[in-house]
Amino acid sequence: MARILITGSTDGFGLEAARQLVDRKHVVYLHARSQERAEEVKTKCPGAAGVLVADLTSVAETRKLAEEANAIGTFDAIILNAGLLYGPFRKTDYGVPAMPFVNVLAPYILSCLLEQPKRLIFIASILHKEAKTDLKDIFWLERGEKEFQDFPAYCDSKFHVMLLANAVAKRFKGTSVTSVHPGYVATKLGGSGATDKMEDGVETYVMLAEGDYDQSLTGVYFVPKKQIGEPLPETTQEDLQETVVKACEDITGIKLPA
């Protein structure tokens, strides 16, 4: 029996993975961005051990989530599942748009502040292969709202979070750090035109959460059906990884543990 935290678990992959892990007798904590969403998900996954509430576009609330999770105890597995795909620029703390905040900065803050788990799973996307790899203006502070386009920004953010995951993997000894492309399915993010099966992605979540794989693997990219995928080669470049880490540290003032 494992203790598991899944961020962004009120719908989609996060919710379905939580349901299956609860059915498999694990102690699962959910996360919702608001109290209203928390009350709703309690009825969708009644076997969950609890629901933590935090808006991951806020540094203060992301810190609070880490503090409340740490108060529960060390987790066996943490799935950093929360993410944004579509939407307006919407400035958040430090002037960062909501999308790169939720997709990159929030996972960075949580990686820094949460007690180190046995397994840490970042949610990537095959769309990281469509990203710009020059890492200029990661958080849109120079380009601003006039140049913002949500789909390219999403692709870039998933490239950035994979670089972050690989940087964390090098630092967190004793933790299997992985990233996963869940698949293109008809969730809130995927939309109605999606072609993959949710179950194929969820079974990968469940495998990684339970540790039903070689946990000496770290810095590895998984895809649906429990398979290891081929990421963009640039995701393995240490200079790019450290550029993302430094950008996150410069914005937040929070240092990633060595």
Swiss-Prot record:
The keyword NADP appears for this protein: yes
Top-rank taxon, per record: Eukaryota
Coiled coil: none
Residues the entry annotates as binding NADP(+): 37, 55, 81, 154, 158, 185, 187
Catalytic residues in the record: 154 (proton donor), 158 (lowers pka of active site tyr)
Cleaved signal peptide residues: none
Entry keyword ATP-binding: no
Enzyme Commission numbers on file: 1.1.1.-
InterPro entries in the cross-refs: NAD(P)-bd_dom_sf, SDR_fam
Family of this protein: Belongs to the short-chain dehydrogenases/reductases (SDR) family.
Record-given protein name: Short-chain dehydrogenase chyC
Organism: Penicillium rubens (strain ATCC 28089 / DSM 1075 / NRRL 1951 / Wisconsin 54-1255)
